[in-house]
């Protein structure tokens, strides 16, 4: 049975209360990957996958999820500034549907609006060269996406009195 693909808050209800989450920033040429600690407080970068074929990319992502004992996936959804979904969001949803057929890990979709721009500004502010930025931006965007999702879940947990 395919994994559920849900908005972040609904996906969180499917995940156990603790356990690592894998965060993904899906690009046309690369996939940035981040992982949380089991308590879901901190996101750290794992790697940038150079995209080849869906089968190859999915195999690497699921191997990372297994290695990190992940209990769920957070996929950045590139929503337009007017809250509509364009071709990139549709492509991300298609990737999620295909990935869901290969795993039982619930997939949470998280609004990634401006994540790459925010990361690029931060890297520029830290005087990271253009060449180095190109190599690390997708992994850092995955960190940004996953940390945003973790922070949102932490706020919700505090407001509901959960862990």
From Swiss-Prot:
Recorded GO MF terms: nuclease activity
State what protein this is by name: Putative pre-16S rRNA nuclease
Q: Extract the InterPro entries matched here.
A: RNaseH-like_sf, YqgF, YqgF/RNaseH-like_dom, YqgF/RNaseH-like_dom_sf
**SMART domains for the chain:** YqgFc (SM00732)
Query: What EC number is given for this enzyme?
Result: 3.1.-.-
**Domain of life according to the entry:** Bacteria
Q: Might you name a Gene Ontology BP term for this protein?
A: rRNA 5'-end processing
Q: Which SUPFAM superfamilies match?
A: Ribonuclease H-like
- What is the role of the protein in this entry? Could be a nuclease involved in processing of the 5'-end of pre-16S rRNA.
Species whose genome carries this gene: Rhodopseudomonas palustris (strain BisA53)
- Mainly resides where? cytoplasm
- Sorted UniProt keywords: Cytoplasm, Hydrolase, Nuclease, Ribosome biogenesis
PANTHER family associated with the record: POLYNUCLEOTIDYL TRANSFERASE, RIBONUCLEASE H-LIKE SUPERFAMILY PROTEIN
As for family, the record states: Belongs to the YqgF nuclease family.
Location in or out of the cell: Cytoplasm
Q: Name one GO cellular component term.
A: cytosol
């Amino acid at each position: 049975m395919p994994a559920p693909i849900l908005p972040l808050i609904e996906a969180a209800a499917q995940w156990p209360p603790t356990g690592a989450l894998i965060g993904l920033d899906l690009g046309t040429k690369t996939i940035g990957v981040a992982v949380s600690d089991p308590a879901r407080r901190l996101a750290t970068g794992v790697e940038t996958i150079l995209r080849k074929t869906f089968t190859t990319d999915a195999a690497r992502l699921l191997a990372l999820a297994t290695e990190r004992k992940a209990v769920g996936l957070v996929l950045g959804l590139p929503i337009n500034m007017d809250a509509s979904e364009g071709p990139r969001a549709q492509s991300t949803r298609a990737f999620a549907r295909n990935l869901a057929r290969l795993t039982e890990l619930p997939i949470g979709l998280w609004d990634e609006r401006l994540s790459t721009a925010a990361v690029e500004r931060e890297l520029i502010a830290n005087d990271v060269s253009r060449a180095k930025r190109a190599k690390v931006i997708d992994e850092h965007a995955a960190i940004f996406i996953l940390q945003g999702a973790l922070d949102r879940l932490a706020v919700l947990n505090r407001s509901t009195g959960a862990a």
